[in-house]
Amino acid sequence: FASAAISGGDETTPISFSLSRCNFVEGANTIAVEMHQSDATSSDLSFNLQLLGNIGGGTPVISRGPYLQSGSQTSITIRWRTNVACNGRVEVGTVLGAYTIAGPDESCPTTEHSVTITGLVPDTKYYYQVSATDGTVLQGDADNYFRTNPPENTTRKIRVVAFGDCGRGNSAYQDDNLANYRNYLATNGIDAPDAWILLGDNAYNSGTDVEYTNNFFGIYGNNILKNHKLYPAPGNHDYGNSSANKASRSMPYHSIFTVPQNGEAGGVPSNYQNFYSYDVGNIHFLSLDSYGTEADLTSMLPAGSSTLKTW
């Protein structure tokens, strides 16, 4: 489970994790927690742990997302969070309300949902519906759609939007930029770009889960997150805004996002979340982590055997 690095005023905010019942075994269970100071001279470490059980009940409601991950020509991963644990289901179709393709139902009740749909047609617009497996529809309307990536031989224009420092925690600034961007889409008759790239610093100030909720999902969750295929990269704020965390790979960023690190969207598999590549039409993208440190950076980068693209 992803951990977090916090400092200053963030230290007074509890960090919560949801554990599915499938994480437990019958009998005794051990929960291990490891804590570190940011440096050898820091002396104000304290720790409290509270374990709460939810025996079930309650109607699930989406509290984060849905958002689109690891988009390729023939597949996509849809993620979301619910207020109570349930088994998730995703259905898609080329006509709104007529969902003819379904991903695998989640086998374990959870609040952190992720379903991958495969077998899709390239460069095709699909509508999707997110539900619980008991039939409770959580979301599925005209704004819940995506377009699969076009093939390499496409001749149409490829549209890409890049957001940097988009989770800065200034709602007035973010709302204004978002309004201008959405106005551009509407004025030019564009549903959504083919890729939405995050350049880092996605949740100020320390990249905590609460800050992601407020400063990223709270801003974009009710609009473009539903229909923009997202390809993220981390920045210093996603590492807790601390150089002491440069080697950490257990920040909330790493559990929030799913990236095509296994070559499922084109390119050479990196098998590593912080460095990955993907194709959108005849364009090949590389996503690089410029803040974190690696013991062996060369092993994280593609070996050069990928087919060359026009761009």
In which residue ranges do the predicted regions lie?
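Short low-complexity, flexible loop/linker segments enriched in glycine and/or proline
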Residues: 1-4, 302
